[in-house]
Amino acid sequence: MTKKSRFDQFGFQPFIGLAIDKLGFYEPTEVQQKLIPGILKGESIIGQSQTGTGKTHTFILPIINNVNPEKDAVQAVITAPSRELATQIYNEIRKVTKYSEKEIAVQLVIGGTDKQRAIDKLKKQPQIIVGTPGRINDLIREQALFVHTAKTLVIDEADMTLDMGFLNDVDHIAGKMPANLQMLVFSATIPQKLKPFLSKYMENPRYEHIQPKVAASKTVEHRIMATRSRNKLDLLKNVLVGSQPYLAIVFTNTKTTADEVANGLIERGLKVAKIHGDVNPRERKRTMKQIENLDYQYVVATDLAARGIDIQGISHVVNYELPDDLDFYIHRTGRTGRAGHSGIALTLFEPADEDRLNQLEKMGIEFKHVDWKNKEFVTLEDRNRRAKREAKRETADPREIGMRKKAKQKGKPNYKKKINYKMNEIKRRERRKKR
């Protein structure tokens, strides 16, 4: 007897239930549990969550459920900031709609494909359109795509959409849609620059922040290394070369820093690939192909640009700087140690990073404190040993502390023996109290 799927609670159409069974889904993820009921009812929602939380099915399942196959008009528009992400969403939708008895038309429109062919195909409008903001906007301007009939707009990876300069395109798309539009925005972070756009189109949206689960992977070793007064790029280069990675990805927080690091490593004789929002789609696609072919051993990337790209065989992840949003640490380091292989996640840190390292430790990350000496990693003592020693002192009995001080002073014969006897007597009393 098969287990009853917990997706039944949402009341999806039977063909969606069949698709869910075929996909092997049983238990909804946290984001699905929280947001699917509201999306089915037509609520506008901002969902702050990382990739890998089941986010895509959170919006595609209710959208497919609510589509009217009898109506040859656009009913939902889904934007994603990269061709890879848009294609992934389209493929996931097709895995569900193929079980529908009545055909649900879904069309993918992305840059780098034949625009005229897309226009010809749009002579019959699809019920669901998925694509990159630039290409969707182009087709609206060409009057080939009509979105005024759509009830729902999804902006997936909104922070990346902003970072890659697509927000104006999304603004134009939203402006052509009905006033009572259901807008679903998904983003790992909510940057300040995104907020005016959200307030323009969303009145009192529901907001949900789904915290990532820290999977304490036994295959990933989390290391931290203080840069101290050393040249950070020299140190990084020495570590990368000395570690002999199968494939190493170095993460930075900004495009500017990614350029500086990549150029600095190239100047130091390394062959380095670079992935960030200012790299044009064609070059990005070529770079990805070269990485897959192992033409590069070292990749420098920003969090936003690396999102949605599945790079196989990463043996080392290096945090050139700790991310401001610690959710990204989980996402970065989760790229290594996959499929049973071991992985190393190394963070180069400064004194100013101590608070964030402490927060990560509270989240369940166990760090190994290392340094780079004589072309190899050496293990150091716990960086918090002094603080732990101080804390231990503070919890000691004040009388015992006083006795210790006296024991260090010079005194009469057998003086230290008497002091030690008294200290042991104090400890015995304390132990009796705790019984």
Swiss-Prot record:
Q: Where is the Helicase C-terminal domain?
A: 235-378
Q: Which UniProt keywords apply?
A: ATP-binding, Cytoplasm, Helicase, Hydrolase, Nucleotide-binding, RNA-binding, Stress response
Q: Which residues form a coiled coil?
A: none
Motif (DEAD box) positions are: 156-159
Induction summary: By growth at 3 degrees Celsius, and 3.5% ethanol.
PROSITE patterns given in the database record = HELICASE_ATP_BIND_1, HELICASE_CTER, Q_MOTIF
Q: Which GO terms describe its molecular function?
A: ATP binding; ATP hydrolysis activity; RNA helicase activity; RNA strand annealing activity
Which terms does the UniProt entry file under GO BP? response to cold; RNA catabolic process
Query: Which domain of life, per UniProt?
Result: Bacteria
Record field: catalytic activity = ATP + H2O = ADP + phosphate + H(+)
SUPFAM superfamilies registered for this protein in UniProt:
P-loop containing nucleoside triphosphate hydrolases
The name under which this protein is listed is: DEAD-box ATP-dependent RNA helicase CshB
The organism's lineage is: Bacteria, Bacillati, Bacillota, Bacilli, Bacillales
- As recorded in Swiss-Prot or TrEMBL, the protein's gene is named cshB
